[in-house]
Amino acid sequence: MVRGLFIGRFQPPHWGHVWAIKAILSEVDEVIIVLGSAQFNYIEKDPFTVGERIWMLREGLREGGVDLSRVIIVPVPNIENNAAWLSHIKSYLPPFQVAYTGNPFVAMLLKEGGVEVRQQPIFDRGKYVSTRIREMMIKGDSTWRELVPNSVARIIDEVKGVERLRVIITGEAEPHRW
C-alpha cells in the first residue's frame, strides 16, 4: 500500500484542493491530509478553527466525490524549528511513502529528510487560492462561493465566517498585542 502526504492550511478548502486530492488519489492508495497551523484561528491568515477546517474539508471532499475511506485528516500544530519540522510532522502521522507539495521550502525540508517529493497537482492557481477567497469575502464579493464546494460555503455561513473575517481585520483580534 502506498500512502501519500498532502499538507495545507485549508483556510478555507476550495475546489483546487479537492481536485488536487483526487489527482493524488489516482497515484496512491491513501492520502494523509495534514491541516497545518492547527493551533491558529481567529486571525486574518487563519480565520477558521481546526475543527471547522476538518468539517469543511470532509464535506467538500465528499461533495467532490472523494472516497473518504482513503483519506486520513490529521491536524498538526506548527513549531518554530524548521530543522525539527519533519520529525514533528511524522510524530503525528502513520507512515507515508511520498509527499506532494507545491511549496519549494516544504519540498526542501522533506527531501532533506529523505522523503520522496512529487509536485502537487495545481489547478488554476490564480483562481483557486485561499488567500484570494478570504480577500473576496472581506470585500463582499460573493463570487467566492463559486470557488469552494457548496458544502464549504454552507459551513462558512453557519459559523459566520465572513462576519468573523470582517471583525478580525479591524485589528481587535490580536490579543498578543494587547
Curated annotation (Swiss-Prot):
Kind of enzyme, top EC level? transferase
The pathway that the record names for this protein is: Cofactor biosynthesis; NAD(+) biosynthesis; NAD(+) from nicotinamide D-ribonucleotide: step 1/1
Cellular localization per UniProt: Cytoplasm
What would you give as a GO molecular function for this chain, any one?
nicotinamide-nucleotide adenylyltransferase activity
Q: Which GO terms describe its cellular component?
A: cytoplasm
Q: Which UniProt keywords apply?
A: ATP-binding, Cytoplasm, NAD, Nucleotide-binding, Nucleotidyltransferase, Pyridine nucleotide biosynthesis, Transferase
EC numbers listed for it are 2.7.7.1
The entry sums up its family as follows: Belongs to the archaeal NMN adenylyltransferase family.
What is the protein name stated in its UniProt record?
A: Nicotinamide-nucleotide adenylyltransferase
Instruction: Please name the taxonomic classification of the source.
Output: Archaea, Thermoproteota, Thermoprotei, Thermoproteales, Thermoproteaceae
